[in-house]
Amino acid sequence: MKSVVNDTDGIVRVAESVIPEIKHQDEVRVKIASSGLCGSDLPRIFKNGAHYYPITLGHEFSGYIDAVGSGVDDLHPGDAVACVPLLPCFTCPECLKGFYSQCAKYDFIGSRRDGGFAEYIVVKRKNVFALPTDMPIEDGAFIEPITVGLHAFHLAQGCENKNVIIIGAGTIGLLAIQCAVALGAKSVTAIDISSEKLALAKSFGAMQTFNSSEMSAPQMQSVLRELILPT
């Protein structure tokens, strides 16, 4: 199979390697269809920021089940799936409390081990979930980044009937805007320094947008105060 391999000092190459085999009964092999490039990948590519080299990055990806281990009976070849890249230890105090993202001994697909910039990958069954049959497979690669905004809404006890302000209309912000609208926000406001991104924010459901590079700090404070304080 082909994979994108990163060496040190920003060197990127396409390499041929053996298709990985399933070694444990709780594993599945995924034929990757779509894999996103995260902002966190950039220092790993250009600033020697990965844990080791050479490495295949990619932690936002979707694809189709290609093979399953003997202990997997709820997924079958051809099923569309997305990947959850976090690999907690499940035994440390934080994991036992359910705070898997705080695991002291976590592993991570596409960062601490080879990831989704390849044609195939073998992962644990618990690290993939089936996608709706009517979802375009490319959309599945957005599942991991969309959870960033959803996590914030979860910490805020939801956003239904609330005034939601998204600061930064990059990929994560634009996904959060769509989530806020879908979850019943009273209003959704986007703030950025890029007019192009703010236009995208409007197209994705933001009810009002502000370019903070064109406003003074007192003006921005006044806008935020009006948005946050009840009338």
Task: Label the predicted regions.
Residues 20-35, 48-93, 132-134:
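Glycine-rich beta-strand-centered segment in the early N-terminal region that forms part
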Residues 40-45:
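Cytochrome P450 core scaffold surrounding the K-helix E-X-X-R motif
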Residues 89-167, 215:
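NAD(P)H dinucleotide-binding glycine-rich loop of Rossmann-like/cofactor-binding domains
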Residues 166-169, 181-231:
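Adenosine-nucleotide cofactor-binding segment
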